[in-house]
From Swiss-Prot:
Mg(2+) 3 binds at N263, S267, E271. The lineage of its organism: Eukaryota, Fungi, Dikarya, Basidiomycota, Agaricomycotina. Its EC number is 4.2.3.88. Mg(2+) 2 binds at D128. It comes from Cyclocybe aegerita (Black poplar mushroom). This is viridiflorene synthase Agr2.
Length: 389
């Protein structure tokens, strides 16, 4: 905590010094018509130490089936993305190691289960990149294609997205329980249409309030579907009344928020470099609270500390209820609810681990930034990742 405070104070003083220097230099040049001042120092901010915040969560390392499942999933994904993605974009996908996130977040599943999670994540990331380049109207069309493919066995519009999703449904989805399958499809419907809403907001240049953003982001993250996958792979078919239990939902929402808040912190530089930073919690916090970038990052870090406490308290409450429960059916439901929360905890921690292994957020400096937590901003609108590049 002391080191974090010292680092934060140092960067605040540095920013103030840069501002004063810029003003003094500008006044001198205006009066004396001398050579222009040198370029300003790059803007930096310090990431919250989420690894420390999440150190109470389970850490089972990397799934031992990673290499085999990854090779299979990449070969499967390549069959569909080559028609849509150019050579540079295909290489970008490879360097992002999207399959690796599932090996950190589902360390307990067998090879077939891991392969299912990898295929699903390749679909999610593919949809995310495609809709990042689309208008709100086109993004809604992509959402409809995805949902119809998941729900309608005979639907096929010939697109790569449709055929990829159809293949996933036939290969994996049929093995999940009825309650889990129903929730998965409902969550997919909401998530993909929420992604289209995000595209509409980007078109209009609209930044939501903190409350409005958190509500939308819970859906655009797609994390609900990943939680459904966790239940399915642990052979859990949670009854709806247990799923709706207020205590369980407190733990569920806390885990959900922790995943996308970490993602927003780590992806901020990449998104602002593309000009897409309107859909990021740091932008939202800065706009509503008038905080600077560093203070906004600190604000989110404190929020994560509150949420991890909420998550742990919910889990403990359910464990106490289980210890007193005499009804076998209710006890079984409570046991599955607790197991589900443990699975979500793997997701929260594994997401952070993966974020510093992939080059998606920090490029070749990922290991350096993991150690220092100092992010240097890339110039805004300097990155253009075209799908066909």
């Amino acid at each position: 905590m002391v080191w974090d405070f010292v680092l934060s104070l140092f960067h605040s003083l540095l920013a103030a010094f840069q501002t004063l220097t810029s003003w003094l230099t500008g006044s001198f040049l205006f009066n004396n018509k001398m050579a222009p001042a040198p370029n300003p120092a790059p803007v930096t901010f310090i990431l919250p130490d989420l690894e420390k915040t999440f150190n109470s969560l389970p850490d089972d390392g990397l799934n031992p089936h990673h290499d085999v499942a990854c090779a299979e999933s990449r070969e499967w994904f390549a069959k569909y993305n080559k028609k849509v993605l150019g050579a540079q974009m295909q290489e970008f996908f490879r360097r992002c190691k999207f399959e690796l996130i599932t090996s950190y977040t589902y360390p307990y599943v067998d090879k077939e289960g891991l392969r299912a999670t990898m295929d699903w994540h390749n679909i999610l990331w593919f949809f995310d990149e495609v809709t990042d380049t689309e208008t709100g109207k086109d993004a809604h069309k992509s959402a409809i294609i995805t949902i119809r493919t998941l729900r309608e066995p005979d639907f096929d519009d010939g697109s790569s997205l449709c055929r990829m999703v159809r293949d996933f449904r036939l290969s994996h989805l049929s093995r999940a329980g009825p309650e889990c399958t129903r929730r998965f499809l409902e969550h997919c419907d909401v998530a993909f249409h929420a992604g289209a809403v995000e595209a509409e907001l980007r078109e209009k240049g609209e930044v939501l309030s903190i409350e409005g953003y958190l509500k939308l982001r819970r859906e655009t993250s797609g994390a609900r579907t990943c939680f459904d996958m966790a239940e399915y792979l642990m052979d859990i078919d949670l009854p709806q009344d247990m799923y709706d239990d207020p205590v369980f939902q407190k733990g569920y929402i806390a885990a959900l928020d922790l995943i996308f808040l970490a993602n927003d912190l780590y992806s901020y530089n990449m998104e602002q470099a593309k000009g897409h930073n309107g859909a990021n919690v740091l932008t939202v916090v800065m706009k509503e609270t008038k905080l600077n970038l560093q203070s906004a990052a600190d604000y989110v870090g404190v929020l994560c500390e509150k949420l991890i406490k909420q998550f742990q308290e919910a889990k403990s409450t359910l464990e106490n209820r289980l210890a007193k429960e005499k009804n076998p059916a209710k006890a079984a439901a409570l046991k599955d609810a607790i197991r589900s929360l443990v699975g979500y905890g793997h997701w929260v921690r594994g997401n952070v681990e993966w974020s510093f292994e992939t080059e998606r957020y920090f490029g070749k400096k990922n290991k350096e930034i993991k150690k220092s937590r100092v992010v240097t901003l890339t110039p805004t609108n300097s990155v253009n990742r075209a799908l066909k590049a």
